[in-house]
């Protein structure tokens, strides 16, 4: 409906934002993210195949409503209110996902046990800079956010359409003809949202770690898990504490570090999750213009409460370009 309402906007969106126009289940997008196997895209045993998604493939959605509250009763009442309003106006609910912070010692952690959401970018114009904490990156003149050591301030255009971006403060006006820009004015101050419902197989993760341990006993399961993630379960960076989990909570160290002294990945492997998604090396391609704003919401009970239940992470992210910031480039 959106495309039919404005054919000019539809053409421009398809040209500039191809993956958004195609949708997440399109072969190009699904293959490069690993949802489909490049060598066997129709594998019936592939649990990540878009055909098995709860939404986003055959169950296309046009909007997502996010309702949050610390009061379960208030939350339930608001959900019912919105459902009634949707029914009144002929809006069909495709899927409802409940999620909440995990209880007890897992508070702030995801189902595999690792502390989540530690490293987030700050946004220029929203987060004041710390005059006493400049970034070591010469390309980051805005420095670190006040009260958040290691949190670099990123230009708002990396998350909000129509604002200046890291590589070109004049974007988009200098890169496209005025007629092109004017047709996209309705998108200004908006953002592209990526939603992924990620199931987590806790038993499989634990078994995989155990089976991969070196036979000589030089590494235990906690250390191998930390090598894969780049942090111990407490959130302590393995670069700061390579031998054991020290439960580091100091803001000046838990996120304020680089891999400058570990170029070969001897402390934090180069394949570690946090190093792949945010290299922290100031000369890395796309280190600043590939940042996204992430929000993770666990769903399902902790594994130790009900091993058979479905569980995972409801991943939500905001960005200026799905192709440029979320989807990896084709190999």
Predicted regions located by residue number:
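Long, low-complexity, Ser/Thr/Gly/Pro-rich intrinsically disordered segments that act as flexible linkers
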Residues: 1-331
